[in-house]
A protein has these predicted regions:
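A detector for small-residue-rich transmembrane helices and their helix-helix packing motifs
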Residues: 1-236
């Protein structure tokens, strides 16, 4: 299912979420220049650099950040940015701009390290040398936070060409279950990279996001809006 809208209106313009989306497209277009296409791999993250079993073009302490803004194809970036546009705005609305920015990068780091640990522990040496890139780990953290903050909101989307409406609880729950199943299949198949998809990054990011949202909500530091407030808020 492709999500198109969550039916919730943010109380404030989601400046951080929009800026992240713009930055991702800007970086994508930059690396699409003919003489720079090969350079995308130089800025990608390589799991083997963490345990020094290989030497990557960049230190892993830098490349985990740069890799979050890189994508391998148009469908890769469009899918990621669609999910971020639909779910990110209201997570930022609840967190506040600066906290959301820190959360996004922290989620990306946790997701990257989860994938790295799985690859180094269960994958082959060749898989540890496969470049990791994409924003999906950080976006998975956003989805996990949304799952906790807005479980009863309605997600409007498409299954193939058919419009559907489903609660966020079931949509994101099903999404997470799929990632979890695929990650476990990757384990038993000795393919921790999941056939080119970083499923462990998605699982790690989602769990991190859900835990952070739960803790911050319990501490009173995050204030998700209720549906009646959302209905009266300006549309963003």
């Amino acid at each position: 299912m492709l999500p198109l809208s969550d039916g919730l209106r943010a109380r404030r313009f989601p400046i951080v979420n929009v800026s992240i989306i713009v930055a991702n497209f800007a970086v994508w277009l930059f690396y699409e220049l003919p003489h720079l296409r090969h350079a995308v791999f130089e800025a990608s993250f390589y799991p083997c650099t963490v345990n020094n079993s290989c030497s990557g073009p960049e230190s892993w302490g830098v490349s985990w950040i740069t890799a979050m803004f890189l994508h391998g194809s148009w469908d890769h970036i469009l899918g990621n940015m669609l999910f971020l546009a639909v779910f990110g705005k209201n997570v930022e609305d609840a967190f506040g701009a600066l906290r959301y920015l820190a959360f996004y990068f922290a989620g990306g780091f946790v997701a990257t390290m989860t994938q790295t640990l799985a690859t180094l522990a269960f994958g082959t040496a060749a898989e540890a040398r496969v470049p990791n890139l994409g924003a999906s780990g950080a976006i998975a953290a956003v989805l996990g936070a949304y799952f906790v903050l807005y479980p009863n909101s309605n997600v409007f989307g498409l299954i193939v060409i058919f419009p559907v409406r489903i609660s966020a609880y079931f949509f994101l729950g099903a999404w997470f279950l799929y990632q979890l199943i695929e990650a476990n299949f990757g384990l038993f198949g000795s393919a921790a990279n999941g056939g080119g998809v970083a499923f462990f990054a998605h699982v790690g990011g989602f769990v991190f996001g859900a835990i952070v949202a739960w803790l911050l909500t319990g501490a009173g530091l995050v204030a998700p809006q209720d549906r009646s407030t959302a209905a009266r808020a300006p549309a963003y």
